[in-house]
């Protein structure tokens, strides 16, 4: 088995909730991450915007709190998702979320 695990913190910029035709609750957030990291002994600004998908009953208790401006830390795995326009994009499927504010 190969490793695919990511922990990322940031601020929610957009969120939406819906239920699938099978009745599964989903929350989709856009997470904005800003930080500074050292690379090759130089400080580098890091900026990422990535979609995070939270699916199933384990996230229903926090779903109402996942609004723009809220800081969170998510842990999950990355995968490609094909958009309606046919373009592939990298997304995170959350396995855990922690509210920071």
Swiss-Prot record:
The keyword rRNA-binding does not apply. GO terms for cellular component: primosome complex. It comes from the Bacteria. Pfam families: SSB_1. Residues 1-101 form the SSB domain. One of its GO terms (biological process) is DNA replication, synthesis of primer. PROSITE patterns: SSB. Keywords: DNA replication, DNA-binding, Primosome. The keyword Transmembrane helix does not apply. One of its GO terms (molecular function) is single-stranded DNA binding. InterPro entries: NA-bd_OB-fold (IPR012340), Primosome_PriB/ssb (IPR000424), Prisomal_replication_PriB (IPR023646). Homodimer. Interacts with PriA and DnaT. Component of the replication restart primosome. Primosome assembly occurs via a 'hand-off' mechanism. PriA binds to replication forks, subsequently PriB then DnaT bind; DnaT then displaces ssDNA to generate the helicase loading substrate. Belongs to the PriB family. NCBIfam families: PriB_gamma. Involved in the restart of stalled replication forks, which reloads the replicative helicase on sites other than the origin of replication; the PriA-PriB pathway is the major replication restart pathway. During primosome assembly it facilitates complex formation between PriA and DnaT on DNA; stabilizes PriA on DNA. Stimulates the DNA unwinding activity of PriA helicase. This is Replication restart protein PriB. It comes from Shewanella baltica (strain OS155 / ATCC BAA-1091).
